[in-house]
A protein has these predicted regions:
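Solenoid-like repeat scaffolds
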Residues: 1-2, 26-40, 66-80, 106-117
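Residue-level signature for tetratricopeptide repeat
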Residues: 11-14, 50, 91-94
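TPR/TPR-like (Sel1-like) alpha-helical repeat modules
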Residues: 99-117, 137-152
C-alpha cells in the first residue's frame, strides 16, 4: 500500500546515513508481505542494507548470494544485479576476504561500466577501502578518473546532507582517502 511505499522512500536515506533508529520495523524483520510484488525487490534491498548498517556482514554476504542466485537472469540485468554484487563486495571487505571482494567488484564492473553506470562505484568508493580505485586502475583505467571525479563531487554534499539529516557532525577537512584511513583506525 501507499503507506509502505512512503516508508520505503523514507527508509533509504536512513540506511544511507547509517541512522538505524529510523529504519522501519518491517525492513528490520524482512517482512515484505504488505508491499506490492513490484516493490519487493526494493524491500529486499533495504533489508540487505539494514544488515550492512548493523554490521552483520556474514549474514549480508549469504543473503546477497542467495538473492543473486534467485534474481539473476541470463540475457539481461537490472540495477539490483549490480547493487547486490556491491553489497557482497562490501561484506567481503569487512570480513577481510579481499580477494573475494575484488571478484564481486569485478563482476559488478563487468555489468555496469560497459553500460555507463558509475554511480554504484561512487556510492561504494568508501566502503571497500581502496579496492575500487585499484581495480579501476588495473582493469578499467578509462573509468578511474570519471568515477573518482563524481565521487569527489558528491563527497562534500553527502557530508552536508548527513550532518543535517542525523544532526551529527562529520568534518569536511579530511579527504576521502584520509577519511577511509580514519575509519580503519577506529
Amino acid at each position: 500500500d501507499s503507506a509502505h511505499m512512503a516508508e520505503v522512500a523514507l527508509t533509504y536515506p536512513s540506511l544511507s546515513m547509517k541512522d538505524m533508529g529510523r529504519v522501519s520495523q518491517w525492513v528490520q524483520k524482512g517482512d515484505f508481505s504488505r508491499l506490492l510484488p513490484e516493490a519487493r525487490p526494493m524491500g529486499m534491498y533495504l533489508s540487505l542494507k539494514n544488515l550492512q548498517g548493523q554490521r552483520r556482514y556474514a549474514e549480508l554476504l549469504c543473503a546477497c548470494k542467495a538473492a543473486i542466485a534467485l534474481w539473476e537472469r541470463e540475457d539481461t540485468f537490472t540495477i539490483l544485479d549490480i547493487y547486490l554484487r556491491m553489497l557482497c563486495a562490501t561484506a567481503c571487505y569487512e570480513l577481510d576476504r579481499v580477494d573475494e571482494c575484488d571478484d564481486h567488484l569485478l563482476e559488478a564492473m563487468k555489468i555496469a561500466l560497459p553500460n555507463g553506470f558509475v554511480t554504484p562505484f561512487v556510492q561504494s568508493w568508501m566502503t571497500t577501502g581502496c579496492e575500487i580505485e585499484h581495480l579501476l586502475e588495473q582493469r578499467y583505467p578509462q573509468w578511474r578518473d570519471p568515477v573518482e571525479r563524481v565521487s569527489m563531487a558528491t563527497w562534500k554534499n553527502w557530508i552536508a546532507f548527513h550532518n543535517r539529516y542525523t544532526r551529527e557532525t562529520i568534518t569536511t577537512l579530511l579527504t576521502q582517502r584520509e577519511y577511509r584511513v580514519a575509519q580503519m583506525i577506529v
